[in-house]
Amino acid sequence: MRRILCALTLAAYPIGGVLADAQTSATEIAVHGSHNAKVTLVYEHELPNVPGKSVKGVLVEYGPGGASVAHTHPASAFIYATVLEGAIVSKVNEGPETVYRAGESWSELPGDRHAVSRNASSTEQARLLAVFVLDTGETNLVLPY
């Protein structure tokens, strides 16, 4: 399972020429109610060996003190998130608030509620890459609850 998740994370980085039919242009995603946060779809590609499923890479950038509102994701979405820079405070469902630092990861299962997602610092930027595996037709990736 860990190898599959690592492969999906690597697949989220655009690789010129290798995935010619993949979307590699960035598209900002509107997340209403977030503070000092930018969410950008940086990659998407249908999974050729899993009909009806796609992988999407989403870059989340928090400025100092930045945060997202409590949210969930499409019911079909499995998410593997890796902190690229800084530190992120995350709380999924009724679990504890956990601080993840650069290089650390967590996952969210279909139906999970992301109660807390914020930058742990009030002075430094933080970034994470969330890799979604979900139904191909899903376009609204962040849903308030």
Model regions and ranges:
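Extracytoplasmic low-complexity repetitive segments enriched in small/polar residues
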Residues: 23, 45-49, 60-64, 89, ...
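Structural motif
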Residues: 55-57, 78, 126-128
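Extracellular/periplasmic catalytic domains that process cell-envelope and extracellular macromolecules
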Residues: 49-53, 74, 82, 99, ...
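Conserved short histidine dyad/triad with adjacent acidic residue
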Residues: 56-74, 96-100, 109-113, 135
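Ligand-binding loop in jelly-roll beta-barrel domains
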Residues: 96-97, 111-139
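Glycine- and acidic-residue-biased ligand/ion/polar-headgroup-sensing regions
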Residues: 75-95, 102-104
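A short, N-terminal "cap"/entry segment at the start of jelly-roll beta-barrel domains
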Residues: 2-6, 13-56, 97-99, 106-107, ...
